From Swiss-Prot:
Name assigned to this protein: Phosphatidylglycerol--prolipoprotein diacylglyceryl transferase
Family, per entry: Belongs to the Lgt family.
Residue sites binding a 1,2-diacyl-sn-glycero-3-phospho-(1'-sn-glycerol) per the record: 134
Highest classification ranks of the organism: Bacteria, Bacillati, Cyanobacteriota, Cyanophyceae, Synechococcales
Subcellular location field: Cell inner membrane
Pathway recorded for this protein: Protein modification; lipoprotein biosynthesis (diacylglyceryl transfer)
HAMAP family associated with the record: Lgt
Its job: Catalyzes the transfer of the diacylglyceryl group from phosphatidylglycerol to the sulfhydryl group of the N-terminal cysteine of a prolipoprotein, the first step in the formation of mature lipoproteins.
Pfam family for this entry, one: LGT
Length: 278
């Protein structure tokens, strides 16, 4: 059984350190170190990742928040200023992926860097960062699943339970499911990166990113079906009956995009003369 100690790590006067913030900082630092090492193995520009990461994190967080607020506008319409209170929770990974990708495209054009190579270098760190960041949901007692009595159940305080589940105490720890899934995906991506670095002729740039899209989306579609707080169109959470879960729809689209990307990369690679293969 899991029980959250609360969202605040410590508080000293006006200074408050939250677990979520600490986890995000950890994910960024680990991602910086890992991506920098992978960038060296791909012979990318020195200092590229350290220059890119602050911009990528900033705009990804902004995109994640805007995406969430857009689909939850009914909760912010009367108090738009609350949309800025990101420390209260409410970000969406798909918004971060969209904003982060746009930022990366512009950055690579500015620095004349190979977009697909940089994207592949970042993919393992993104998966690992998600595995770490999901534990923020645990400390905030949010993004949990339907009630359950399994041995690994998660206790949710009364104040954090939806009204229709007010009498339930234990729920699926969907944060844990997604954290484990992303950790396994990270290991897979790292293995593929090492293998692809030796077999560039059979592993064109962009392959790793497509594998990430497919792998993450498969897990998210399953896990999202368990959650009781989905972003929803056509119905209201927690049931979302008769509506569409936005994360499942986006994940399905990204999975198709990843599959088409692999097909296109393979086809393009086959059309290249052998002497120009990388």
């Amino acid at each position: 059984m899991f029980t959250s100690p609360g969202p605040v790590l410590f508080q000293f006067g006006p200074l408050t350190l939250r677990w979520y913030g600490l986890l995000i900082a950890m994910a960024v630092l680990i991602g910086l170190n890992l991506s920098s090492r992978l960038a060296q193995s791909r012979k990318l520009e020195n200092g590229l990742i350290s220059d890119l990461l602050p911009l990528l994190v900033l705009f990804s967080v902004i995109g994640a928040r805007l995406y969430y607020v857009a689909f939850e506008w009914h909760n912010y319409a009367n108090q738009p200023i609350k949309a800025l209170a990101i420390w209260e929770g409410g970000i969406a990974i798909h918004g971060a992926l969209i904003a982060g990708t746009l930022t990366l495209i512009l950055f690579c054009r500015w620095r004349s860097q190979p977009f697909l190579d940089v994207l592949d270098v970042l993919a393992p760190s993104v998966a690992l960062g998600q595995a770490i960041g999901r534990w923020g949901n645990f400390f905030n007692s949010e993004a949990f699943g339907v009630p359950t009595d399994l041995a690994w159940k998660l206790f949710i305080p009364y104040a954090n339970r939806p009204v229709i589940y007010a009498d339930a105490e234990f729920f699926h720890p969907t944060f844990l499911y997604e954290s484990i899934w992303n950790l396994l995906l990270f290991v897979l991506l790292l293995v593929l990166f090492r293998w692809g670095s030796r077999e560039r002729q059979n592993f064109p740039a962009g392959t790793l990113s497509c594998v990430y899209l497919i792998g993450y989306s498969l897990g998210r579609i399953w896990i999202e079906g368990l959650r009781i707080d989905p972003l929803c169109v056509g119905a209201l959470p927690p049931a979302c009956e008769g509506g569409v879960r936005i994360a499942q729809l986006m994940s399905a689209m990204l999975m198709v995009l990843g599959g088409l990307g692999l097909w296109w990369l393979k086809r393009r690679q086959q059309q290249l003369p052998v002497s120009t293969n990388r």
